[in-house]
Curated annotation (Swiss-Prot):
Annotated organism of origin: Homo sapiens
Note: The human olfactory receptor 4M1 (Q8NGD0) is not the one to one ortholog of mouse Or4m1 (Q8VFT4).
CDD domains from the UniProt entry: 7tmA_OR4N-like
PROSITE patterns referenced in this protein's UniProt entry, alphabetically: G_PROTEIN_RECEP_F1_1 (PS00237), G_PROTEIN_RECEP_F1_2 (PS50262)
Topology class, membrane: Multi-pass membrane protein
Extracellular side: 1-25, 80-100, 159-195, 261-271
Name of protein: Olfactory receptor 4M1
């Protein structure tokens, strides 16, 4: 890449979601409500799984890790977005932008890999029930979770490494409420086609391949379960769990594919999809998993009664 005497950009200006004051106040109330549900909701999931002796299966261990990632993921953009609703000029430093990029892709990719691990867990539980405890032992679960985090870290490092080598000489306005690669690449003062191609292959291709693989695996499991649909409550519970996982997979991978598996051009739906991806999706995880899982709901009631209500008395 050619070097020149560029005026180095030290900060980026975010356009936000709306310029209308009334709309900003409404959005602030809505997103603050979401965030205040995401944090305690996922913390309650983690505490319930940690404290209840009956929730010791690998599925709940993975669910606790998913809840932790949701807390982290929502906290990357939500706090600054909420503050920016009351700021006339929404600014983020270059370093802050790079940090936001890194953690978004680190946590987001880790969550995708973790969902893949959860699909393998369901496969072992349904197809190899007699050997499930041996196959999905705690040691293997810890290794798979660690590999998910490591995969997310490597993916994020690649994305950030491609961004920091680009020159930025102005303009410095990002048509978004947070720093994302698709926006930052667009304002670089250089030909970014090679970088875009690598990013699309890294983010977009991974999303598409994982999404197709996950849908195929769950379709196979559901077809297998439907053959034994009259065999009892355990089969119905397994089908319910699979439907929950499929819902999460679609909600996670759909927006990601829309954003990253195409050229980084601007479209009218970009902000809406980004809001769904960064704010609404972490909200749906605890709702879907708790509402469709009787064991988790019962355990949550016990934890709330024992550790919260009793202390208040």
């Amino acid at each position: 890449m050619e070097t020149a005497n560029y005026t180095k950009v030290t900060e980026f200006v975010l356009t936000g979601l709306s310029q209308t004051r009334e709309v900003q106040l409404v959005l602030f109330v809505i997103f603050l409500s979401f965030y205040l549900f995401i944090l305690p909701g996922n913390i309650l999931i983690i505490c319930t799984i940690r404290l209840d002796p009956h929730l010791t299966s690998p599925m709940y261990f993975l669910l606790a890790n998913l809840a932790l990632l949701d807390i982290w993921y929502s906290s990357i953009t939500a706090p600054k977005m909420l503050i920016d609703f009351f700021v006339e000029r929404k600014i983020i430093s270059f370093g802050g932008c790079i940090a936001q990029l890194f953690f978004l892709h680190f946590v987001g990719a880790s969550e995708m890999f973790l969902l893949t691990v959860m699909a393998y867990d369901r496969y072992a539980a349904i197809c190899r029930p007699l050997h499930y405890a041996t196959i999905m032992n705690r040691r293997l679960c810890c290794i798979l979770v660690a590999l998910s985090w490591m995969g997310g870290f490597i993916h994020s490092i690649i994305q950030v490494a491609l961004i920091v080598r680009l020159p930025f000489c102005g303009p410095n306005e990002l048509d978004s409420y947070f720093c994302d690669i698709t926006q930052v690449v667009r304002i670089a003062c250089a030909n970014t086609f090679p970088e875009e191609l690598v990013m699309i292959c890294s983010s977009g291709l991974i999303s598409v391949v994982c999404f197709i693989a996950l849908l195929m695996s769950y379709a196979f499991l559901l077809a297998l379960l439907k053959k034994h649909s009259g065999s009892g409550e355990n089969t119905n519970r397994a089908m319910s769990t699979c439907y929950s996982h499929i819902t999460i997979v679609v909600l996670m991978f759909g927006p990601s594919i829309y954003i990253y598996a195409r050229p980084f051009d601007s479209f009218s739906l970009d902000k809406v999809v980004s809001v769904f991806h960064t704010v609404i999706f972490p909200l749906l995880n605890p709702i879907i998993y708790t509402l469709r899982n009787k064991e988790v709901k019962a355990a949550m009631r016990k934890v709330v009664t024992k550790y919260i209500l009793c202390e208040e008395k």
